[in-house]
Curated annotation (Swiss-Prot):
Residues of the Peptidase S8 domain: 1-321
Provenance organism: Podospora anserina
Localization annotation: Membrane
Pfam families tied to this protein: Peptidase_S8
Similarity comment: family membership: Belongs to the peptidase S8 family.
Stretches for region Disordered: 79-98
UniProt keyword terms in alphabetical order: Hydrolase, Membrane, Protease, Serine protease, Transmembrane, Transmembrane helix
Name under which the protein is recorded: Subtilisin-like protease het-Q2
Length: 366
């Protein structure tokens, strides 16, 4: 078994545990995963999200304490591969047996977000059957467009698109372009994977165009270099990168369950989606009301719902590396923060929060 990537995600998880102070009265970030569906029968989803892995192969999940089962955070599901139209209202949460995933791609992506973004709610749109490799990476654009419009009715804040298009006639992409612009008008952030065609190929669309999505490349666990399969940096798009090599994700129950290793920009994308969700969760939490009111008088915090605004924040959290690629910081706002000596935890907590809001103010006001 290849070495499991743990460095980046360990930094992210420890930062969340130490710096975010969520309460159940805080607004909840809602994320749409539009992919191959979701395997609700996987036993791990009946437990709280994984805190860490143990065992001889480091693949035995140890759940977080005092958190709800992951399945309760799946709030809606619709199969766009079937002819039945989706409802335009939020209904009851889906039952595990009612959700389908034949490939495991969507389950892996949703599982990463459930693990990395505590309390975030998910809505799942199945937009590809997952039995054909070409359809998996580039499903019917009109189907994805319909799923985006459904996600808008589900009041999501972020959409994960681990898919993309190459050499597609513009006419075929027009419905999807329109849906992406509609999502922007609804202050919904869209993240898309750039693809894994290597440095001789450009990024897939919409990741290649900053007008439609925030593009994400895969990089190594240290965040120091893009993966060998990463396509070349886009001239007109964001070139964020996050760990996408040897990530441990849920394996379909029908294939034995448990976990397996995957690599690619498809899986780096939900890592960055989780970071964006954590940024929103931090800003919205009750603990930050005073800072939110103060900073909100100086800058437009609503810009966090725009591609440009969130893009600037993600740049502020990370650093430019390896040419035009930009590594997203797994320590969130606190990469350059100097820890106190622990003698006055309450004071240090306030100072850490003040530091974070300083970073945020500078990024949004740019």
């Amino acid at each position: 078994m290849s070495a499991i990537s743990h460095h980046s995600l360990s930094h992210l998880n420890s930062t969340v545990s130490k710096r975010l102070m969520p309460t159940y009265s805080d607004p909840v970030v809602r994320i749409a995963v539009l992919d191959t569906g979701f395997d609700g029968s996987h036993p791990d989803f009946s437990h709280p999200r994984t805190a860490y892995f143990t065992g001889p192969f480091s693949d035995l999940p140890q759940p977080e304490k005092d958190e709800e089962p992951q399945l309760t955070r799946i709030k809606a599901y619709h199969d766009f591969c079937q002819p039945s139209p989706p409802g335009d209202r939020q209904g009851p949460p889906p039952q595990p047996h009612s959700m389908v995933d034949l490939a495991g791609h969507g389950t892996a992506i949703a599982g990463l977000i459930l693990r990395l973004a505590p309390r975030a709610e998910l809505v799942i749109g199945r937009v590809c059957h997952g039995v054909d490799s070409n359809e998996l990476s580039a499903p019917d654009p009109s189907r994805v467009a319909a799923a985006i419009r459904w996600a808008i009715t589900q009041k999501v804040h972020i959409i994960n698109l681990s898919l993309g298009y190459r050499n597609q006639p513009l006419k075929e992409l027009l419905p999807l372009r329109a849906a992406l612009l509609e999502a922007q008008r609804s202050n919904i952030l869209v993240f898309a994977s750039t693809s894994n065609q290597g440095s001789h190929e450009p990024a897939a669309w919409p990741a290649s165009d900053a007008r439609f999505a925030i593009g994400v490349h895969s990089c190594n666990d240290m965040g120091s270099a893009p993966s060998g399969s990463s396509c070349k940096a886009s001239e007109n798009g964001y070139n964020f990168m996050a760990v996408g090599e040897n990530l441990l994700v849920h394996r379909l129950a029908q294939k034995g369950g448990g976990f397996e290793l995957v690599s690619g920009s498809s899986f780096a994308t939900p890592v960055v989606v989780s970071v964006a969700a954590l940024v929103l969760a931090f800003v919205w939490q009750e603990e930050c009301k005073r800072e939110r009111d103060e900073v909100g008088r100086e800058v437009m915090l609503e810009d966090l719902g725009s591609l440009g605004g969130m893009g600037r924040v993600l740049m502020a959290l990370g650093e430019k590396t390896a040419g035009s690629y930009w590594a997203v910081g797994m320590k969130l706002f606190w990469a350059g923060y100097r820890e106190g000596d622990g003698r006055d935890p309450e004071k240090e907590e306030k100072e850490a929060r003040r530091w974070a809001w300083g970073v945020l103010r500078g990024a949004v006001a740019y």
